[in-house]
Design a protein with these regions (language model features):
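Core alpha/beta structural scaffold of self-assembling particle/tube/pore-forming proteins
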Residues: 1-62, 74-408
């Protein structure tokens, strides 16, 4: 006798989708939100903003005897710091058919166009958060063992994901040796998988199109971030700190050693000893902050013999009364000591959609066909954010690099 079951009657059964769609991405953008939303941004127009910086005091000084010759007059050294605007974009594309199919709740969980336009703002903030931590040249990672191979080994793969299209740039910034799609990332081995490309040690990887090679060392279209700001012996905002040491940040290499309380205090003192004010925040990774918490826990003393309600973990970590905060986009093995008032997000235009060529306020347009004069049933749109990061006083910021931490 034939038994009626869910298999042979599947055509009359319904599928119930009662749960909402879920986005399981790493969307938190702490530093960007802190600087752009909690701190005043600075609006400007033009190619760049600049501000005068006094880099050396008047040296026309001296102590003399009775009726001695007075010192020869000196003057302060003042230079213009130039902060160039950076232009950032996200491209969106969807078919006209999917727009119609998802127009109401009967057809889709969510309208596809609404979803894409909502998500792109989150994605742009996340990308901005990554760039706030940039070293020079917008590097995603540096090749540590050059090879002609599908597998490339980097110092870090923290900011690289499957699907990224990346350029391989020679160490001198003069040659792009190939554009490749990333098909695999091994965060333990710190390698990426791409179509075969030939690299040399110290070559570096950037997002496709974000670096323009040239015979003079090339130009990054990304922001000069905290790793560059807190470094020493570098050019920041067109001022060379090898000439003017007061323009240096405060950098200490840890050589793989743990960053303990004493090291945090050293960073605090390095910044404070510049005599321009103390820092106000530590910013680091989960692994480094956890090690710091473990050090504090090992030193804990319970003076109340009746204390029995002991809870694990911690709610806040402070060193020298300054909060130690985690940001998952902070580079691994790194601790920053920051003075947030010295960091300014400079906006030429707020995040928003680029208007179409028609100039009628529209933000979407039909895609051009490969045949001249024809269109295809696909909509296109671009989200833009023209901004950069300015540091008014790099000496009030610092960094510990190469700290003991988790893997990439």
């Amino acid at each position: 006798m034939a038994t009626t079951n869910t298999t042979n009657t599947g055509a009359i059964l319904k599928e119930l989708y009662s749960l909402p769609p879920v986005r399981v991405l790493r969307d938190k953008s702490f530093l960007h939100d802190k600087l752009a939303k909690e701190k005043p941004t600075m609006d400007f127009s033009g190619r760049y903003a600049y501000f005068p910086v006094t880099l050396q005091r008047n040296l026309g000084r001296g102590s003399r005897g009775d009726a001695g010759n007075l010192p020869v007059a000196g003057t302060e050294t003042i230079d213009d710091a130039k902060v160039y605007i950076k232009r950032h974009y996200y491209a969106l594309e969807w078919s006209e058919a999917i727009e119609v199919a998802s127009k109401n709740k009967e057809g889709a969980f969510e309208n596809v166009v609404t979803m894409k336009m909502k998500n792109v703002a989150i994605d742009m903030a996340k990308e901005a958060n990554r760039q706030l931590y940039n070293a020079s040249q917008g590097r995603l990672g540096t090749i540590t063992a050059g090879a002609a191979s599908v597998t490339q080994t980097l110092d870090s793969v923290q900011y690289i994901f499957v699907g990224d299209s990346v350029d391989f740039i020679t160490a001198n910034g003069q040659t792009n040796t190939g554009t490749r799609a990333v098909t695999g990332v091994d965060r333990t081995a710190s390698t990426i998988t791409v179509a075969t490309v030939t690299t040399t040690t110290n070559d570096f990887v950037v997002l496709e199109g974000n670096f323009a090679v040239s015979g003079t060392g090339g130009e990054s279209y990304e922001v000069e971030g905290l790793r560059h700001i807190a470094a020493e012996d570098r050019t920041l905002h067109t001022i060379d700190s090898t000439t003017y040491e007061e323009w240096d940040g405060n950098a200490t290499a840890m050589g793989g050693n743990p960053a303990g309380e004493s090291t945090f205090e050293q960073l605090y003192d390095d910044i404070g000893s510049r005599q321009r004010g103390d820092m106000d925040h530590y910013l680091t990774t989960r692994g480094i902050r956890r090690r710091l918490a473990d050090e504090f826990a090992s030193q804990r003393r319970y003076l109340n013999e009746k204390a029995v309600d002991i809870k694990a973990g911690y709610s806040a970590i402070e060193v020298n009364s300054k909060p130690c905060i985690i940001d998952d986009d902070c580079p691994k093995k790194t601790v920053f000591g920051l003075t947030l008032d010295t960091l300014k997000v400079m906006e030429a235009i707020k995040p928003g959609f680029l208007e179409t060529e028609a100039g009628d306020g529209a933000v979407v347009e039909l895609k051009d066909s490969s045949t001249a004069g024809q269109k295809v049933a696909v909509w296109q749109s671009w989200y833009r954010y023209h901004w950069t990061l300015a540091c008014l006083d790099p000496g009030r910021n610092g960094v510990l690099t190469g700290c003991a931490d988790e893997a990439n």
